[in-house]
Amino acid sequence: MKLESNGVAFSYPGRDVLKDVTFTFEGPQLVAILGPNGVGKSTLIHCIDRILRPTKGTVMIDDRDTMDMKMKEMAKTVGYVPYASSDTFPMSVVDAVLLGRHPHSNWRSTRKDVAIVYDILKRMGIDDLAKCQFNELSAGQHQKAMLARGLVQEPKILLLDEPTANLDVKHQLGVTKLLRDLTRERKMLTVMICHDLNIASKYADSIIMMKDGTIFAAGSAEDVITRENIETVYDVKCRIIDDGGRPHVILQDGTL
């Protein structure tokens, strides 16, 4: 599946957020979006998912304008997991995750739907929480359950806004590796906003680095994760070492 952004711009009254964002990605691959706070990363994800309508430009999926796609078709094609969602439904974890099957089941869950949910819960390492109350989970458990809900939707394109927020280092690595593996298994295109440069470098197939509402650099980790790019975009000193063929960032004290 191909995802294109053609000259996408978005503005709030008196403030331009996105400016001429253009890219093309085809699955299966994991794409990481990097950049400081406030550069338009979440706004870009919202434009892709039609939460926001671009002020200019188009978002295309397999050469079709997303604005021309019916809502149910979009729901089957694109999944979205927001940043640190505050959803706290008074229901079991398994029932909360089952909501992700709605585009396929029309609210009538089948045995297949339940089996898909339990499989993802197991792979996320939270199958033991299936009968727990969703609104009683810790922040990290809640984040994993929200990711599970996005994954059981079985979208062709999965959009993730900081999917490892609220997770400790071990689970950040585990979840990102699982996302990469599922992306390949399911032949998905996964696009995730990430603030950890080294996790993005380690697991992403392609990286977008944003600055001032547009794409500053794009390509492989080797192309994007460079000292010059990081110092320009983040205004911090760093050095880069090789970590098994991937760049690894070591931050240094002080700003430029």
Stretch-by-stretch model annotation:
Residues D49:
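Helix-to-loop junction immediately C-terminal to a conserved catalytic motif
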Residues G57-D65, M74:
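Conserved ABC transporter NBD signature motif
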Residues L98, R111-L129, E154:
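Conserved ABC ATPase "signature" region
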Residues Q133-L137, Q141:
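Conserved ABC ATPase signature
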Residues L158-E162:
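Catalytic Walker B motif of ABC-type/P-loop ATPase nucleotide-binding domains
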Residues V233-L256:
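ABC ATPase nucleotide-binding domains
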